[in-house]
């Protein structure tokens, strides 16, 4: 089955797995998915990233994080912003702050995929892929 929006598929898989309190989830491997996963790990939303398989069957296994005795998901919400039908680009001054800085906007820039904080520090804008909080 072809997937027309692999980023939305990735976000949905993570959202569903965290709601069911799974410890890991697998997503089809791509450079963009791996870049987004690395940003999520750097920002503390996921615990680990492992790649399995080769070629078109390769998968990325993400370790999900939970907090507290009742295992509340670290990722409360993930929202896709820029979609294949409507791309959203922002310059440095217009980059959004998610929940007043508590959340993260993941930005695809000319220097790679990074969080909104890193993009502001480097003074570059780009395509706003998603919000995570």
Swiss-Prot record:
Domain of life: Bacteria
PROSITE patterns named in the record: RIBOSOMAL_S8
A Pfam family reported for this protein in Swiss-Prot or TrEMBL: Ribosomal_S8
Spans through the membrane: none
Gene3D superfamilies: 3.30.1370.30, 3.30.1490.10
Any Gene Ontology biological process: translation
GO MF entry, a single one: structural constituent of ribosome
Keywords for this protein: Ribonucleoprotein, Ribosomal protein, RNA-binding, rRNA-binding
InterPro entries xref list: Ribosomal_uS8 (IPR000630), Ribosomal_uS8_CS (IPR047863), Ribosomal_uS8_sf (IPR035987)
Assembly and binders: Part of the 30S ribosomal subunit. Contacts proteins S5 and S12.
Similarity remark: Belongs to the universal ribosomal protein uS8 family.
The protein, known as: Small ribosomal subunit protein uS8
């Amino acid at each position: 089955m072809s997937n027309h929006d692999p980023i939305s598929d990735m976000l949905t898989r993570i959202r569903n797995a965290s709601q069911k309190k799974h410890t890991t989830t697998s997503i089809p491997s791509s450079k963009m998915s791996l870049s987004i996963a690395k940003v999520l790990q750097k920002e503390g939303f996921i615990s680990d990233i492992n790649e399995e398989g080769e070629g078109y069957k390769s998968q990325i296994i993400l370790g999900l994080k939970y907090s507290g005795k009742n295992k509340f998901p670290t990722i409360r919400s993930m929202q896709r912003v820029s979609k294949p039908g409507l791309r959203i680009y922002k310059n440095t001054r217009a980059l959004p702050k998610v929940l007043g800085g508590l959340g993260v906007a993941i930005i695809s820039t000319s220097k790679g995929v990074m969080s909104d904080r890193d993009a502001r520090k480097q003074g570059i804008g780009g395509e706003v892929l998603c919000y995570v909080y």
